[in-house]
């Protein structure tokens, strides 16, 4: 029950050649790469202004900007400088002698 030499060589050649089933996942990973790039581009694009002032759960999560401002409390606006607190001038009740 020996296999002829030609059949052995042909079976070796077919195992060395890339099969069509291995090329299909490459196409799928390219699709995943494109999807990943699309998600990243959405993350880095500037956020659009939203004038919604409601703080209910539905409004806090309806867009990314509202989630950052209302849900997490993060605001990147320019912070105003606080004015120095004025010291209260009190008259000395007992003069030092």
Swiss-Prot record:
GO annotation, biological process: positive regulation of viral transcription
Region described as Core: spans on this chain: 67-77
Region (Disordered): 1-32
Start-end of Low complexity biased regions: 14-29
Pfam family of the protein (one): Tat
Family as reported in the entry's similarity comment: Belongs to the lentiviruses Tat family.
Domain notes: The Arg-rich RNA-binding region binds the TAR RNA. This region also mediates the nuclear localization.
Protein name: Protein Tat
Annotated organism of origin: Human immunodeficiency virus type 2 subtype B (isolate D205)
Gene label: tat
């Amino acid at each position: 029950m020996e296999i002829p030499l030609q059949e052995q060589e042909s079976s070796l050649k077919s195992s060395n050649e890339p099969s069509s089933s291995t090329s299909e996942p490459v196409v799928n990973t390219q699709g995943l790469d494109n999807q990943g790039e699309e998600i990243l581009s959405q993350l880095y694009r500037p956020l659009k202004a939203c004038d919604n002032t409601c703080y209910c759960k539905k409004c806090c999560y309806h867009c990314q900007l509202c989630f950052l401002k209302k849900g997490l409390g993060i605001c990147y606006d320019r912070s105003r400088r606080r004015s120095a607190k004025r010291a209260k001038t009190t008259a000395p009740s007992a003069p030092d002698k």
